[in-house]
């Protein structure tokens, strides 16, 4: 006798998915074309057909705890070839956005970031923190003066680190709490659905899987397997490597400042400065390409979350480069102003990272790692 499964539809979940870009959900009649044409779907329990079925039934828990929603790169192959005009890629993107909110705490920040009416608040918060903390500590000087433009004379590096080091700890803590639940949930889901035979997660084996999957992420191999939006890999790689480059630059100059006591501004002939400038330009160009791609792809859904992130990344790059260019042009007021605005963008990017679409960098990496670790498509040896 077949086992029984009690279906408990979540109508509110269906409503949210429709609002966030998955409004084509009801067009699906489960023909499985999407799973067949998807070039990156696994052989064992392929997606996205089963996700479309579960979403139409409002099976929130089954979807949010599945790592398969993160394996999708929203390339658009399935949406283009769907005979009914459904868009599985957009539906899975909406489910991922929902999952990010589920795993990030406190929920208040998730609601704040996802509400376009509260966008000004996201910029007011760091502005108030900078001014109040800067004036209280005396590390913010609105009249730096001097013959040379030195941003640390206006906004002290001590103030920067006083704000951003605890902020980094905050982000790591939120991700740690979310990932602990996330890994446990996707493993339980994989076991119950037959996607893995490993009863427990071996930390050493998981780390080995992570090391193995990193080259795939850095080369964007999954993007290049797609047909419809293969060109997206270029802009995504530009932004990814820009962030990696800027991360390296930040850490090098941190050591240079606090270990060797060498203060900026640094020479344009400095190789590290070259890396910073190249990464900054690539960030602007890459994010601009993403914006252009979003505008041109009228058949694909772009939500407020997409535009918020793209605007944030583009603004981050533009204000950073403008800060430097106005300094070189000896325009003190403009340079200090753009530097302050740039720090607001940096604050937004990091403080709200666990709650924004950018969190997919972390969750997708872990999901890809788990998929590698689970040996999902491993063939049993012939007897």
Regions found by a protein language model. Name each.
Residues 22-42, 66-86, 95:
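Cysteine-centered iron-sulfur cluster-binding motifs in ferredoxin-type domains/subunits
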Residues 16-23, 65, 225-226, 331-333:
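Active-site-adjacent structural elements in folded domains
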Residues 27-30, 64-67, 71-74, 277-280, ...:
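Secondary-structure capping and boundary motifs in well-ordered enzyme cores
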Residues 2-30:
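N-terminal signal-anchor module of multipass membrane proteins
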Residues 1-12, 41-70, 85-110:
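Non-heme iron-sulfur electron-transfer modules
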Residues 103-383:
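Membrane-embedded alpha-helical bundles of multi-pass integral membrane proteins
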Residues 45-50, 54-74, 81-83, 89-90, ...:
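Membrane-anchoring/interfacial helices and their immediately flanking loops
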Residues 52, 69, 76-79, 92, ...:
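Short, well-ordered alpha-helical packing segments
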